[in-house]
Structure formats: structure tokens, C-alpha cells
């Protein structure tokens, strides 16, 4: 039985296929689990305890941030809602 470098040439089967949640080719066909996002787990797989690089790739601020990008502006104004802007008064000309 050969071990090591020659044995690696015999590997030609695909262990991973496309994941239906994250779209990466990281869904393990035998384990039935995605290595990237953790599908079919209910919660997305996190990369918290790893290095800075992987957190920058997958963490908050790398996507659309549809909700988070408005937070700074709303916080500056005190999270007010349902109010009307005061009408602008034209400057008096002489």
C-alpha cells in the first residue's frame, strides 16, 4: 500500500459540491454539511476566533449592510421617527 505523494495522484472524486445557501463549492456530499456557511444549520457559521484576515473577509461591513449603514445617521439625530422637517425660511432681501 502506497502512502504519501504517489497516493495523492489517485484522488479524482469530488468531495464537495455547490452549497445552496452560500453558493460556494464547499458542501460536503457525504457529511451533508457546508464547510463555509454550515448549512443546513439554522445559523450561519462564524469565524470569530480566527485571525484578522478571515474576519475582514466574512465579517460585518463586507456585504450590503442594508440596515447597519443607516444607524450612524439615525443615532446622530437621536433615533427620532415620524417627525416632519421644519420648513426652510427664505432670507429677507433689502
Curated annotation (Swiss-Prot):
Keywords assigned: Cytoplasm, Metal-binding, Ribonucleoprotein, Ribosomal protein, RNA-binding, rRNA-binding, Zinc, Zinc-finger
GO biological-process terms attached to the record: translation
Protein family membership: Belongs to the eukaryotic ribosomal protein eL37 family.
General function of this protein: Binds to the 23S rRNA.
GO cellular component terms listed in the entry, alphabetical order: cytosolic large ribosomal subunit
Cofactor(s) this protein requires: Zn(2+)
Pfam name, any one: Ribosomal_L37e
Source organism per UniProt: Tetrahymena thermophila (strain SB210)
Cofactor binding comment, as recorded: Binds 1 zinc ion per subunit.
Protein name, UniProt field: Large ribosomal subunit protein eL37
Upper taxonomic lineage: Eukaryota, Sar, Alveolata, Ciliophora, Intramacronucleata
GO-annotated molecular function: rRNA binding; structural constituent of ribosome; zinc ion binding
ZnF segments: C4-type: 19-37
Subcellular location(s) of the protein: Cytoplasm
InterPro entries, sorted: Ribosomal_eL37, Ribosomal_eL37/eL43, Ribosomal_eL37_CS, Ribosomal_zn-bd
Amino-acid positions noted as binding Zn(2+) in the UniProt annotation, renumbered to this chain: 19, 22, 34, 37
